[in-house]
Design a protein with these regions (language model features):
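Active-site-proximal alpha-helix that buttresses catalytic centers in soluble enzyme cores
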Residues: 1-207
Length: 207
């Protein structure tokens, strides 16, 4: 699979003059901004692409956060989940200021369902914080869901792996059963639809 830069280079070689790039990131973090900068460089090259627009990732507003959480609750959470069982979303997290979006998402999640939580691998809220709340609430089971485009390395190892520091193992150590959901958000039409809507908006701005 081409990197965004390789794909843009190939499109330039093939004579395309207007290109819309759709980010499949969750938030506008460091990687998103890197793609944004690199994409614009192609529009500045002599004989390059005339216009390049990079569209927004999944979460950029109150509306998109609420829509994403509704998608989680209606499309991703297993139907057998009981109200006293927790749902813990695993976000990637980042040192970029946009990491604050995960805390905002957590706030909205708690307003939607008192047992819906958002943790991150590399940012805030941390899993340690979430685990402490689960213990305090005497939660007996938690569904672990990757809040990521694909259920890749973080989901397989950091979330559902058998190593002592995985989220599943850490919950087991305090007597909480886990129910990992091994699917990324790109496997659900509700989220694909959000990205496609962003792409359509970007394409409408190509002149």
């Amino acid at each position: 699979i081409d990197s965004p830069e390789m794909a843009l280079s190939r499109l330039m070689d093939e004579g395309y003059t207007k290109v819309a790039v759709q980010s499949l990131h969750m938030i506008p973090g460091a990687e998103f901004h890197e793609i944004n900068v690199n994409a614009r460089l192609f529009a500045q090259m002599a004989g390059g692409i005339d216009q390049v627009i990079v569209s927004w990732p999944l979460l950029v507003s109150d509306e998109t956060m609420e829509k994403a959480l509704q998608g989680i609750m209606t499309r991703v959470v297993p139907k057998q989940r009981q109200a006293d069982e927790a749902i813990v979303l695993m976000g990637h997290g980042t040192h970029h200021p946009s990491d604050a979006i995960y805390s905002a998402l957590m706030y909205k999640a708690q307003k939607m369902d008192a047992n819906l939580f958002v943790g991150t691998v590399e940012g805030s809220p941390s899993f340690e914080e979430i685990k402490e709340v689960l213990v305090r609430k005497k939660i007996r089971k938690a569904y672990l869901i990757p809040f990521m485009t694909v259920a890749g390395d973080h989901a397989m190892n950091d979330m559902a792996g058998n190593e002592p520091d995985s989220w599943k193992s850490q919950l087991a150590s305090v007597g909480i059963e886990s129910g990992p959901v091994m699917k990324g958000l790109a496997e659900f039409d509700a989220f694909v639809g959000m990205w496609i809507a962003n792409l359509k908006t970007a394409m409408a701005h190509l002149k």
